[in-house]
Amino acid sequence: MTLPVVTRFAPSPTGFLHIGGARTALFNWLYAKKRGGKMLLRIEDTDRERSTQAAIDAILDGLKWLELGWDGDVVYQYANAARHREVVDEMLAAGTAYRCYASAEELAQMRESAKAEGRTRFYNGLWRDRDPSDAPAGVKPTVRLKAPLTGETVIEDQVQGRVVWQNDNLDDLVLLRGDGSPTYMLAVVVDDHDMGVTHVIRGDDHLINAARQKQIYDALGWEIPSMSHIPLIHGPDGSKLSKRHGALGVDAYRAMGYLPAALRNYLVRLGWSHGDQEIFSTEEMIEAFDLPAIGRSAARFDFAKLENLNGHYIRHADDQSLVTMLEDVLRYIPHGDEIAAKINDTTRAQLLQAMPGLKERAKTLLELIHSADFILADRPLPIEPKAQAVLTPDTRKLIAQLRAALETVTSWSAATTEAAMRAFAEQHGLKLGAVAQPLRVALTGRTTSPGIFDVLAVLGRQECLSRLADQASE
């Protein structure tokens, strides 16, 4: 009988949920959903000095924002330390592990000798078959795996293919430190086994770990999960991903105004492909995703592509949802609280009314907020330098005339104000653009905005007449 698929996302809480980790979580989540299985979440907090509660909170928050839910309770690796030690005791009893009393000086000498001789395996087996009665008094030993000295360790990787290591290049790795704390290599194997993990999907920087962990599985007589080591994400120039390239936490992308659906869509295409399709709904991702379609080459992060994709999602988003997302993002941006204080039932309704025009140009929620500034701005309206250049004495006189014409409009709407302005332009022998631009500058403080008649309708009669009066001169 085929076991149900169980994947896991297992971050270390030593910092934020970075973009590479987010993609790993997404791939695990998609594969579990595709196969009708579960994705578990394990926090690998065995490094007590570097693990922080703030980092744990950031990881959980990032996954929730990306809408990558996990199944069951969060597993904390450190809490399983007693179980890890229990397994080591079993291995000692079975003779697949041994106590090592080598001193720091002896280990340093072994490393130097291995380096001089060009060997990757540095530990010389000093305590591998030595009589325990030779143990020096008062020394707390480590416990090492009695790894095979000959032959090969092989991983049939779903992404990388068949990967082979010569056993004479692999050390007797430490399972338990001198203070009794389990090492990462041991803890991962025991936890994956106990959690029933069937598929391990992680970055290919863990590939060498797979060889070492396979030897632990073999020593315990446990079946190794299916392994898939996905390529890392590089910068646009092929170099290691840096903050300049996008190596930021998921929280930073939220604060930059990206939508979770857009970021998921972008991340799924970093290293995985499905023909020429670029836009995927969540349902389409789940339907199409599979491990063999992940490439072996490092994916390149491209901010411009992400921005364009985010713009697509903004343009196709429901207007009410965008207003909600716009309000939500304010808590994560500088001066967001000041903007939030200006949003009330009236301005919220204006934002909703203006959204069809606002979202056409915006690539991020921050651009959307910037475009909506004219709705929330206090009088007198701040005028951008480029717009200020439009406000010549003649233009200010024209604005006074336009205001007088608009004052006659009683039933205020985009259609009625447009009719009034077209009539004014025709009467004065002007093109509509010569009328629209002074209006735009006076009403928004900018030279670009949504359609000017939509702006008139959104702001309402009294606010428009007041703003025009602020910029008019006789």
From Swiss-Prot:
Annotated positions binding ATP: 243
EC annotation from Swiss-Prot or TrEMBL: 6.1.1.17
Catalytic activity entry: tRNA(Glu) + L-glutamate + ATP = L-glutamyl-tRNA(Glu) + AMP + diphosphate
CDD domains in the cross-refs: GluRS_core (cd00808)
GO cellular component: cytosol
Keywords: Aminoacyl-tRNA synthetase, ATP-binding, Cytoplasm, Ligase, Nucleotide-binding, Protein biosynthesis
Coiled coil: none
A molecular function GO annotation: glutamate-tRNA ligase activity
Compartment list: Cytoplasm
UniProt superkingdom: Bacteria
Biological process terms in GO annotation: glutamyl-tRNA aminoacylation
Enzyme class: ligase
Placement of sequence motif 'KMSKS' region: 240-244
InterPro entries, per the entry: aa-tRNA-synth_I_cd-bd (IPR045462), aa-tRNA-synth_I_codon-bd_sub2 (IPR020751), aa-tRNA-synth_I_CS (IPR001412), aa_tRNA-synth_I_cd-bd_sf (IPR008925), Glu-tRNA-ligase_bac/mito (IPR004527), Glu/Gln-tRNA-synth (IPR000924), Glu/Gln-tRNA-synth_Ib_cat-dom (IPR020058), GluQ/Sye (IPR049940)
Motif position, 'HIGH' region: 11-21
Function: Catalyzes the attachment of glutamate to tRNA(Glu) in a two-step reaction: glutamate is first activated by ATP to form Glu-AMP and then transferred to the acceptor end of tRNA(Glu).
Database matches in NCBIfam families: gltX_bact
Family to which the UniProt record says this protein belongs: Belongs to the class-I aminoacyl-tRNA synthetase family. Glutamate--tRNA ligase type 1 subfamily.
Subunit description: Monomer.
Annotated HAMAP family: Glu_tRNA_synth_type1
Protein's recorded name: Glutamate--tRNA ligase
